A protein has these predicted regions:
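A long, amphipathic alpha-helix that forms part
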Residues: 1-19, 29-31, 35-77
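Secretory-pathway/luminal and periplasmic proteins that interact with or process carbohydrate-rich
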Residues: 28-36, 159-166
Length: 204
């Protein structure tokens, strides 16, 4: 509803055509519900699984209220992340691959079209900077700033293009690691009780 209010505001003021709107989802479906779902998500983090029969008998109506911090079971997480593998907090596609929508009628040649180039969250700021025609500031309030790692997505705005201009991208989340380069992705699941050098990698 709030997105609709924003779009209506821009339309009323004739600002729609020259406004870039970026809509990005958060992450993949979570795994904190465990194999059978939980009424209190902290039970997952504390490895204290709740009794499903007790939940159904006594606490089912708590879902959606302040008395619950519920989460769905792994089966629904897998459905939500299909066709990608695994869950939120992991570096497989099920955890980190999300939808990105960019609307800018004045600059995007074919609205509604789908792009398949790889992009990363760090590319959004670089895209905004290039679109505004400005450079990243070297300092802010007297403090030196780190260089951005993202690449602008402007090259995709003019229509479908061949290839991908982006260089390698490394990911890490809670010890799980992955690296993407030229359409290939190497990824590993890290068990916190196992040395990193013993992790098994897969190539996709």
């Amino acid at each position: 509803a709030q997105i609709g209010r924003l779009l209506a505001f821009l339309e009323e003021r004739g600002m729609t055509d020259n406004t870039m709107i970026v809509l990005l989802s958060d992450n993949g479906a979570s795994r904190e519900g465990g194999p059978q779902g939980v009424m209190d998500e902290w039970s997952f983090f504390n490895s204290e699984w709740e009794n499903v029969d007790e939940i159904v008998a006594n606490r089912l109506d708590y879902i959606g209220t302040k008395k619950a911090h519920s989460n769905y079971p792994w089966g629904w997480s897998q459905v939500g992340n299909t066709p990608s593998r695994w869950y939120k907090s992991q570096t497989y596609g099920g955890g980190i691959r999300d939808s990105l929508i960019i609307k800018w009628p004045k600059e995007i040649a074919d609205p509604g079209a789908v792009r398949t180039q790889f992009c990363h969250i760090s590319d959004i700021a670089a895209t905004v900077y290039e679109s505004l025609g400005i450079e990243q500031p070297k300092t802010l309030n007297g403090h030196e700033q780190m260089a951005m790692h993202g690449e602008s997505l402007r090259y995709t705005f003019g229509g479908p293009v061949q290839g991908n201009k982006r260089g390698p991208q490394y990911f890490e989340m809670m010890g799980h690691r992955a690296i993407w380069s030229e359409g290939y992705k190497a990824v590993t699941f890290h068990d916190q009780n196992v040395p990193y050098e013993n992790d098994t990698w897969g190539l996709y």
